[in-house]
């Protein structure tokens, strides 16, 4: 564990605004400033809920993000909610449940750190990144053409937490019309990353071409999630030029663990 005052000073130094919708590059920068192997961020709130007429209760929820420093990837996300008659009772139940789950979080971090990363398989075909429209490589290149639109589901956890977020993934599109590797480069938690991956896997497309011949291509796919609105998909060209709008920020101290950092 790191001293809390040192962490706060490091976060202030890099201008961290409390976002829980980070790109892998942003997460790596954050962990470098803190100096850690993993860091935990999250969102927590207590709200009045009603499931039927003349009934109401208090719900306390927490979304826990465990982020790996080296890759900036989301190593684990956990969503927990507790209901009770009063806000204090709901919050106490939530804290107790978080404390009970803390050992599993530590175990997951240890497993992640010790795991042997499997190298990506060698592509049988050459894969091109989408070129900048103004670059010489853009001449004769046509990006993949999508034949359908797949709307990812807005998860129940995101609904409960009223999440507005963006999920980005670098996706390989093969010449045979198959989807290749999907690498999440901006994660959102709350089940939205999995929803985006599932939607990407259902895309149908005509492959990219260069000088009229099919070529494998790697493109950035972006899904914007908002409550009560349909998630929208956008393919970026070039893939890493535009930064999405900042999501709603909400960083809460979820709990103070008493165990050692793995």
Language-model segments: residues:
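Hydrophobic beta-strand positions
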Residues: 1, 66-67, 172, 207
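N-terminal segment of the mature soluble domain
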Residues: 1-35, 39-40, 73-76, 105-109
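Short hydrophobic alpha-helix segments
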Residues: 5, 77-81, 183, 218
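N-terminal post-signal-peptidase region of extra-cytosolic proteins
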Residues: 20-29, 45-51, 154
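Soluble non-cytosolic domains of exported or imported proteins
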Residues: 21, 25, 61, 85-96, ...
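C-terminal/domain-edge helix-coil "capping" segments
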Residues: 30-33, 67-131
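Amphipathic beta-strand/beta-sheet edge segments enriched in Tyr/Trp
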Residues: 38-85, 96
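Charge-biased low-complexity segments
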Residues: 88-89, 104-262
């Amino acid at each position: 564990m790191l001293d809390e005052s040192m962490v706060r000073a490091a976060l202030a130094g890099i201008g961290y605004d409390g976002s829980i919708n980070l790109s892998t590059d942003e997460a790596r920068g954050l962990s470098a400033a803190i100096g850690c192997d993993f860091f935990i961020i999250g969102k927590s709130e207590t709200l009045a809920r009603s499931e039927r007429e003349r009934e109401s209760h208090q719900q306390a929820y927490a979304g826990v993000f465990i982020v790996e420093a080296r890759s900036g990837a989301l190593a684990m996300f956990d969503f927990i909610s507790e209901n009770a008659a009063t806000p204090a009772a709901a919050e106490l139940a939530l804290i107790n449940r978080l404390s009970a789950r803390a050992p599993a979080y530590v175990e997951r971090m240890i497993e992640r750190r010790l795991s042997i990363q499997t190298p990506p398989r060698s592509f049988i075909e050459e894969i091109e990144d989408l070129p900048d429209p103004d670059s010489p490589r853009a001449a004769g290149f046509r990006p993949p053409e999508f034949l359908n639109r797949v709307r990812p589901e807005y998860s129940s956890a995101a609904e409960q937490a009223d999440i507005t977020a963006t999920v980005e993934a670098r996706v390989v599109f093969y010449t045979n019309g198959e989807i290749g590797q999907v690498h999440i480069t901006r994660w959102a938690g709350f089940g939205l990353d999995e929803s985006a991956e599932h939607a990407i896997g259902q895309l149908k497309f005509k492959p990219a071409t260069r000088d009229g011949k099919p070529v494998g291509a790697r493109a950035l796919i972006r899904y914007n999630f908002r409550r009560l609105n349909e998630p929208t998909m956008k393919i970026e060209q070039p893939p890493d030029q535009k930064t999405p709008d900042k999501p709603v920020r909400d960083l809460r101290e979820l709990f103070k663990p008493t165990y050692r950092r793995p």
